[in-house]
Amino acid sequence: AHTPNGITRILETVRKQYVHRKGQLIHVFGSAGLRDHTKRFAMGKASATFADISYVTEEDYRTEDPQKIADEIGAGFGRKHYLVELNREKAIHTAIQSAKKDDVVIITGKGHEKSLCRGKIEYPWDEIQTVKNILKI
């Protein structure tokens, strides 16, 4: 999910179908740098609306300041608390480690993509393998 609508649809669906009354929906996401700035507020608002806990992190920030991107996303949260961890691997690790029985962790933005752009350099990235490593599977 790279758009406010995509985030809304996946989080709303997961909340309705999988999150039990005592479980929480944990969302890890970011927004790409040097792309549509106007969607960031709405992405934050979507996560604030449907997730219980949100981690805002990097997602191909390119040459844009990742903290600025996080701040623009954060504006969509209004008064609702959210967490910022600009290192994507650390954000995913923290979200997974904090999850309890019946919680669901949703990570949006990178999925099948095989690189993570930081500055002008494309670094190898495998989100699925990252999650498997954290879960030790």
Which residue ranges define each predicted feature?
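ATP-dependent carboxylate-amine ligase
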Residues: A1-I137
